[in-house]
Amino acid sequence: MKILWTTLVMSCVLLGARLTEAQTPLAAPGERAVDATVGNDVLQLRYLGAAPPLNGVGGNLDFGALLTESREFDASANWMFDTDFLPISRLRFQVGPRVDLAWLAAGSKTNVFALGVSAAARYELIHRLGLSAFGSAGYAPGVLTFGSAHNLYDFTAGAEIRLAGRLYALGGYRWFKFTLVNEPDERLVNEVFAGVRWQLE
C-alpha cells in the first residue's frame, strides 16, 4: 500500500503541475552552489546542482544536512521543477518530491524515513545587488513516513544578498518538526539562521 501511495505522490507532483523548462533557484540554469548556515542550536549545510532532464524537462537537485545541539541529524534530498502556477516576472515557483532520513533524540533514539513533497519560491528584489527573498514548505504524510513518526513539516523563509563576486549572505527563519507516535512532537529547528552561499559556477 505504501508503494502505491509513493507512486501516486510522485505522479501528482511531476505530472499534476504544468512543468516548464526549469531554472535552478540560483541566478541561472545549470549553476551550482553550497550553503552553510548556523543558528543558536542548529548547523545546516546544503548543495544545489542541476539534475538530469526528465522527459525533456530540466530540474535541479537540492541536498541538505542538518545537525542540532542535541546531536539530532536529518539528511534530505529534493528534486525540484519549475512550474508556471504563478507567472510573475522575477518569481520562480518550484515543486518536487523529497526524501528525509532522520535520527531523533525523542524518548529513546528514533530513526525516521519519510517521503514527501516540497514547494519553493524565490523572488528577485534588486538584481544589481543580488537581493532576493525566498521561502519553502515541505510535508510528508503519515502513510509515507516510516519509523516512530507520523508526519514531517518543514517551513523556511529568508533573504539573500550578494557580498562580492560569487559570495552571498543568507538569513532567515526555519521551523521543522516531526510528529511522533505516542510521544510529543519533536522540533528539530525553530529559530533564525544566518550564513553564506558560495556559487560554484
Could you tell me what each predicted segment is?
Residues 1-4:
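Positively charged n-region of N-terminal signal peptides that target proteins for export
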Residues 7-16:
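Bacterial N-terminal signal peptides
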Residues 8, 24, 31-35, 151, ...:
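Short, flexible coil/linker segments at or flanking structured domains
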Residues 18-79, 201:
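Short glycine/proline- and aromatic-enriched beta-strand/turn motifs that initiate or cap beta-hairpins
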Residues 34-40, 59-67, 77-79, 95-103, ...:
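Transmembrane beta-barrel strands of outer-membrane/channel proteins
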Residues 51, 83-92, 100-201:
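Outer-membrane beta-barrel transmembrane domain signature
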Residues 56-60, 74-78, 90-96, 112-116:
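Short connector loops at helix/strand junctions that flank enzyme active sites
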